[in-house]
Amino acid sequence: MKLLINSKEQIIVEKVLSLLRFGKQTTRYKDVFDIYYLISYSIDVKKVVKYFECYVFNNENFEEKNMKDVSDSLREILYSKRIYTNLKLKEYNWLNISVDVIIKKLINFFESI
Protein backbone atom coordinates (compact mmCIF):
# COMPACT_ATOMS: atom_id res chain seq x y z
CA MET A 1 0.00 0.00 0.00
CA LYS A 2 1.24 3.47 -0.91
CA LEU A 3 0.42 6.56 1.16
CA LEU A 4 0.13 9.77 -0.84
CA ILE A 5 0.95 12.97 0.99
CA ASN A 6 0.43 16.50 -0.29
CA SER A 7 3.49 18.72 -0.35
CA LYS A 8 3.83 21.61 2.12
CA GLU A 9 3.28 23.99 -0.79
CA GLN A 10 0.06 22.31 -1.81
CA ILE A 11 -1.21 22.25 1.79
CA ILE A 12 -0.52 26.00 2.09
CA VAL A 13 -2.46 26.76 -1.09
CA GLU A 14 -5.38 24.50 -0.10
CA LYS A 15 -5.67 26.20 3.29
CA VAL A 16 -5.53 29.67 1.74
CA LEU A 17 -8.10 28.53 -0.84
CA SER A 18 -10.46 27.67 1.99
CA LEU A 19 -9.97 31.09 3.57
CA LEU A 20 -10.59 32.82 0.24
CA ARG A 21 -13.62 30.69 -0.54
CA PHE A 22 -15.38 31.31 2.78
CA GLY A 23 -13.96 34.77 3.42
CA LYS A 24 -15.18 36.47 6.57
CA GLN A 25 -17.57 33.57 7.18
CA THR A 26 -14.76 31.05 7.68
CA THR A 27 -14.60 28.98 10.84
CA ARG A 28 -11.23 27.45 9.97
CA TYR A 29 -9.18 29.52 12.39
CA LYS A 30 -6.55 26.84 12.99
CA ASP A 31 -5.70 26.98 9.28
CA VAL A 32 -4.24 30.45 9.81
CA PHE A 33 -1.78 29.05 12.35
CA ASP A 34 -1.05 26.02 10.15
CA ILE A 35 -0.19 28.30 7.21
CA TYR A 36 2.10 30.39 9.44
CA TYR A 37 3.85 27.24 10.64
CA LEU A 38 4.31 25.89 7.11
CA ILE A 39 5.67 29.12 5.62
CA SER A 40 8.14 29.38 8.50
CA TYR A 41 10.08 26.45 7.06
CA SER A 42 11.82 25.88 3.79
CA ILE A 43 9.29 25.79 0.98
CA ASP A 44 9.50 26.08 -2.77
CA VAL A 45 7.92 29.46 -3.50
CA LYS A 46 7.76 28.69 -7.22
CA LYS A 47 5.53 25.71 -6.44
CA VAL A 48 3.28 27.87 -4.29
CA VAL A 49 2.85 30.34 -7.17
CA LYS A 50 2.27 27.48 -9.62
CA TYR A 51 -0.48 26.01 -7.43
CA PHE A 52 -2.11 29.43 -7.05
CA GLU A 53 -2.08 29.82 -10.83
CA CYS A 54 -3.73 26.40 -11.23
CA TYR A 55 -6.30 26.57 -8.45
CA VAL A 56 -7.06 30.27 -7.97
CA PHE A 57 -5.90 32.66 -10.69
CA ASN A 58 -7.29 30.58 -13.54
CA ASN A 59 -10.51 29.78 -11.67
CA GLU A 60 -13.47 32.04 -12.44
CA ASN A 61 -14.93 31.29 -8.99
CA PHE A 62 -12.21 33.41 -7.38
CA GLU A 63 -11.80 37.18 -7.68
CA GLU A 64 -8.07 36.94 -6.96
CA LYS A 65 -5.97 37.00 -10.14
CA ASN A 66 -2.48 37.55 -8.67
CA MET A 67 -0.58 37.38 -5.38
CA LYS A 68 -1.36 41.02 -4.54
CA ASP A 69 -5.06 40.18 -4.74
CA VAL A 70 -4.46 37.19 -2.46
CA SER A 71 -2.62 39.27 0.15
CA ASP A 72 -5.27 42.02 -0.03
CA SER A 73 -8.07 39.48 0.46
CA LEU A 74 -6.25 37.82 3.36
CA ARG A 75 -5.71 41.21 5.01
CA GLU A 76 -9.42 41.99 4.73
CA ILE A 77 -10.47 38.56 6.02
CA LEU A 78 -7.97 38.20 8.87
CA TYR A 79 -8.46 41.72 10.21
CA SER A 80 -12.25 41.52 10.08
CA LYS A 81 -13.64 41.91 13.59
CA ARG A 82 -15.08 38.39 14.00
CA ILE A 83 -12.09 36.55 12.54
CA TYR A 84 -9.52 38.64 14.40
CA THR A 85 -11.37 38.18 17.70
CA ASN A 86 -11.60 34.41 17.24
CA LEU A 87 -7.95 34.11 16.22
CA LYS A 88 -7.04 35.55 19.62
CA LEU A 89 -8.71 32.63 21.43
CA LYS A 90 -6.18 30.21 22.93
CA GLU A 91 -8.13 27.18 21.71
CA TYR A 92 -7.15 28.03 18.11
CA ASN A 93 -3.65 29.45 18.61
CA TRP A 94 -1.72 26.20 19.02
CA LEU A 95 1.53 28.08 18.35
CA ASN A 96 1.01 30.53 21.22
CA ILE A 97 2.36 33.38 19.08
CA SER A 98 0.85 36.85 18.85
CA VAL A 99 -1.98 36.97 16.31
CA ASP A 100 -0.63 40.28 15.00
CA VAL A 101 2.77 38.68 14.32
CA ILE A 102 1.11 35.78 12.51
CA ILE A 103 -1.15 37.93 10.34
CA LYS A 104 1.69 40.27 9.40
CA LYS A 105 3.93 37.36 8.44
CA LEU A 106 1.21 35.78 6.29
CA ILE A 107 0.44 39.01 4.47
CA ASN A 108 4.14 39.83 4.01
CA PHE A 109 4.81 36.34 2.68
CA PHE A 110 2.10 36.51 0.03
CA GLU A 111 3.03 40.10 -0.90
CA SER A 112 6.63 39.03 -1.43
CA ILE A 113 6.00 36.27 -3.97
Placement of each model-derived feature along the sequence:
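Structured mid-to-C-terminal alpha-helical surface segments
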Residues: M1-I113
